[in-house]
Structure formats: structure tokens, C-alpha cells
């Protein structure tokens, strides 16, 4: 396992300026909002050359000071790009934002590390905080105000002497909020990890006095031990909310384990009605007293994201990024989404309108069950990544940062791009040398795939229309329905609770968890799942019989799928039975173990002309007769396919259904094998061949089919991580959803989620999904209380209505859809018996 602690650092952009004040030294009742970064895309994957090369330590705090960038950390030396001349800079430096040239006029001397930098109360000033005690020989215990142009100490700001280090600061109005590991802010001022200062004079005030107490993990006997207090502060851009994370259990004596939210009122900061127990678990308590590492607010004030270390402990928020809704209230709150690294530390987070940027010691994301390895759903991301704000899944942005070192310890989103600080020298796989600080410009970035969906009234597309077939019956004897993989009809269910109407009573069912092998008699495309269930006839009573109505004079093939799966009859001669067709024995003394072998699926095809029904009887000889599946297929050439595999109808969502119009599909998706589809933002996503595929579609023209495989990246899959087992690379692992696709009967996209139904299952399921990268969430969820989907042949949603196509009848039914939950009952709105419209198809979706 690779969990490393970075020297702590960082920034918080000032959310207000002193110019917003009406009276010097007082916060306004309604603070002016900070400007949002205004991003309309993710930043470029190629870093700018306009940054210097920091030669040692790490860059842990970055501040955009207009024409300059000011960086703090644990470094002591820097070089201009393309120079080998060291420039001494102890823990703090400034450089030109346009050229990257080190500022020769700004060279303050500090005696220890800088952990945070933010704007000062007036133009051309900047606050710095950290471990230091002197600046330019002037005593400044942990916090100072400097002149941006000269690096001189602004002596009018005379802060108290904090008795411990300051981890983070934030300017709100004319107050400087301070968080760290301290118990006093000057001798007469007890403060437990949080304090507020007059931003002009430095005087301690009584605005923020919340006291943080008790170690998270250290209990006096066991666990790692660290100082108690605040690690990071995040202020909402409107200046009304403060989130504090750190090593503490209580805030003002009330349990707020590692995180507390504070309301920033006009005259006092008070603990908000916001609490969660999700950061209570100890996780790797031997190594970490606290495992929260960074927090950032969204530009619209609506949510914040917390990132952590702590090792991979199932069911916890260790080694995760988690989104929390700022407007939520109460106790026992839960995150909106969680992204798991599967064993690696997150260190930093920055948020734009389009992405949640995270950094750390990462190898993968979407890796819920990973333990220092890539498990189902894992997507390789070396150290830095961009997440979809709606669901936390990785977007396509993937420049990487390898080697990873301790990790990317700082992320700062600005109107022009993204700054990343850390302890290593390269962006990409030794691709772009950017020593310890890099800038990804917004210019040249890529727009995130739209998440707009089509609505009704509008168009409904049916792709893979039911084709004429010679298959008359398919039954999965003893099991639930199984999706066809050959374009034909599905295999109908025959369970104990819902037995097939085509056999008599008195037989029983058995199930097996391991797959059988298949011999050469089994037709290609036959689902192997058929052999996981059987219907057998115990001794005594009438023999097991099956009867299928077939028009008189029709010649058919009767196909019996069988396998000996029971270990007690594994040997030849231990299970023998006869099969009679139309009263005559056609399989005499059938011994499956002798004929095919134990745990081997086989098939016997019998040809007969119907006299009005096909009658089968399974007769005892020794042990119990059995059958796994029955298929009846009319002989002769297959019927001609329908003229167009795709058609569109107008539909108002109620009762007005338009006539079908064909849609040309020149690129030739085999829609007959599709496992439904949905349209989002100009792209149709559909299941086929055990995977998701995507095609652009504008309502008239389909683009070329493209396999959706974000779990493998030609650039990164062969790059060795230098962690874990020898030779481990950043290659991901295909999502578990792909194994479900052969049984998917319907799917739609809504609110960052992919909802879907499964063959033979009554519920409605969902996973997170981002159309930008095509990543499907590693975790499957079930919509609580949803039922009635066992007969679904398609599902789609429009506004507050959920629609379901009945695959047995072709009816279209609807129900209310409120907050991602369907109402209890469906009402038929259209169908063959209602208006003559058959809604069945392999893929049914609302589109442009």
C-alpha cells in the first residue's frame, strides 16, 4: 500500500475584498460574491511553459495575484525555465504569470514553510501563513501580510503570536479566518484551531471562536498521534459558509468528527445544522490520526468536495473524493457521490463549473473494491484527474503526472486555467518537464460532452424492430427468463413461483452457480445460462410432460437442451431416462453423463410434423429425468427481414402517436443484437456484444459505431506505476455493468445516472454514468420500492413521467417519476390493442 503524507500547505482564494465593506473592520451583512472562474470546458491537457522550475521540496500553496503567481511550500531554490542557475527563494516565490520568469523584486526571507497564501485586504498585498516565525527578520508568528511588489512586511498588520502552526487562511470581507494547530492566538486569547483577525490591523476578534477538540484516532493508548485542529478551510464564494476539516472530534463540545460546517453571519460565525458520521471510522489508525486532506466549494455555492487518505477500508470514506450538498441540514447526512481510489491518497481538490479536479498519489478512480489494485470499473489516472460534478466519475481529461511522488498537493482553479503544485518534475509519463508547479490553460481545452436529453412531445426511436423468425417457443426450464443473444426471441421463464404454462405439475427445479461447458451439438449463440437451471421429475406420480400448441401440419425441430449437473449422478449409468415425442420414444435410455460428460451441456434435435400440438414426455428409467431448456423452431428458410431496422414515431407523451418513418443506418449496427439504448447530448449509447457502444446521432444520421472502453488507455496501460506488485501498470478493469448487458432489457440516462432493467428481475437498477468518458460506475444501486419491471422491453423517461414497453404485449405504459423514483403502478397509454401501435424493439429511446 502506498499512503504518503504531503507537507501541508495551501491557499484559499479571498472571497471578498476590503472594497466591499461599508465600515472598516466590520463584515457586511450580505457579503459580495467572489467571481466564479467561468469555465465552459475542461482545461488543456498540455501544460503551459510559463512557469519556473522549483528545485527542491514541494509547492503546497498557489495564489493568483493578477499579473503574478505567488507560490509557497517547503522549497528553497528555483530556476527560470531553460536556465540552470539557482535562485534562492526560501518557502515563497513570485513569478510573472505571462512568462513564468521569477520575480527578482519579490524575495522575502522566511525561516520556515508556507502552507497557505491568499489575497490581502488591499490591492498589491498578500497574506501568507505556515510554520514560520520571522519574515525578513521581523517577528511574524505563523501569519504575515506582504507587499506583492517588494515582498516587504506590511507592518500595519500586526497579528498575534499563534502558539502553533497555521494550516490555512481565508479572507472574508475584512476578516482573515485562520485554521491550524494552535490553542492560543496571543497569550490572552485562547483559540482552539480556529480564529479570526481584523484583516487590516491583525487584531484578534470574537467573530470566529469555534473550538476544535480531541484527536480523531489517538485515544491516549493507540493510534497515530498528531496535533488537534483545522487542516483546511473552504469558504463558499458568496462568503456565507465555511467548511472546516482536520484532526478533531468535536466542535464547541459537540461531535463533528473531522468536519464541521459553520455559518458566517454578519456578526458571528456559528456552527451550522449540518453533521455526518461518515468520517468517524478510524481507517488506518496506526498511520493517520486524521485522514481528511482537502476541501473546496463549487463556484455556485451549492456543494463542496472533501478528499481523504486513510487506506482502502470497505464502507468508509477513506481514500475517496466525496460530494456534499451545502444546503442539506440535519445529522447523519450522506454524500451525494463517492469516488474511491482503491488504496491511494487524495491530497487536493479544485472545482470549476465543468469539473472537479483532484490530485494526490492516485493510480485509479472508480475503484470501489480495489485494494492497491484495479478492480471492476477502475479507470487509470496517474496522480491528477477531472471528475464529473454530477456523479464523481472521471471525465476524459487525462494528462497524468508520472512519477507521482508524494502527490499533487495543491490545485487552484482560476479564470484562465488550473494550477497544480506538488513534489515531482513531470506532467504526463516523463513527457513535459514542469518542476513542482504546472499550469493547464483553459484556452485549448475541450468541452465536456453535453448531458441534455430529449423530451416529449418529441420523437421516439425504435431500433432493431422485431424480425420475422422461425422460432415458435423458447423456455428456460426451471429458471428465470434469459435474454437471447442471436436476435431471436428471449427464453421465457419457468420458475417455481411462476412455472411455464406448457408443462404439467409435479416436477421440481434446481439451480447451479458454476457454468457448464458446451459440446458441439449446442447451436452457436445459445446462452450458457440455460444450463444453470433445470426442471426435473421426482419419482412417483405422473411423468413430466410438455405440450406446445403448433398449427396442424407444421414441421418443426424440437430442441432439448440438457446437462447432468448433479454431482450424485456424475458417473455413467447413474441417471438414465427416456424421452417420448408424440407418444413414441425418440431418446431411449438417455445417459447424459455417458453421452456428453458431467457438467457438459448438450442438445438433442428431433423433427416432427405437428398434429395441432407438440407433446413431450420424460420417462423414468433410473433416477430423475430432467431438461434445461426447450426450443421449438419451424423448419424451412428463415423469413425475409423487415425493410428497415430503425424507425421513428412522433409522440406527445399521452395518446397521440405518429405513423412510423424509416431511419437510414448506413454504418450497419446489428440492432437485432442490441440490448437497448439511450440518447444524450447528440450521442446514442447502446448495449451490444457484452459492452456499451456509442454513435453520434442527430435525428437523421448515425455516426460510426465506437466501442466505449475508458478502462483501457493505449498511452497509460503499459506505464509501470512503481507501486504495488512488480510490473503493475495503470491499466484499469472493465466495469461489472458489461457482464449485465446481455440481460439488460431497458436503459435511460437521467441526472448523471444510467437506469436499467434486467431480464427476469422486477426491480429498477442504476449506476452513475458520464457520457463524456463513457465511464460506468463501479457500484450498482437499486431504486428503493421500484417494481413491475420483469416484463420490460424498454424504459425511457421524459420530465416527470417514466415509460415502459411491455416486451410480451408491445404496450407502452407510464407512471409518475419523482426524484428518481417511479410510482407504484403503470397505466397503459398505447399498444396493439389500444391504437394498433407495437412499441417493441431491441432499442427504444427518446431522441432529437
Label each region the model flagged.
Residues 2-4, 11-12, 27, 31-462, ...:
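Extracytoplasmic surface signature
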Residues 16-27:
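Hydrophobic core
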Residues 63, 350-351, 466-469, 608-610, ...:
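Extracellular/periplasmic catalytic domains that process cell-envelope and extracellular macromolecules
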Residues 68-69, 481-484, 685:
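Primarily extracytoplasmic ectodomains and periplasmic/lumenal surface modules that are beta-strand-rich
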Residues 454-640:
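Compositionally biased, intrinsically disordered or flexible polar/acidic segments
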Residues 480, 584, 682-683, 752-753, ...:
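Well-ordered beta-strand scaffold positions
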Residues 841-847:
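Short, low-complexity, Pro/Ser/Thr/Gly-rich segments in the mature regions of secreted, periplasmic
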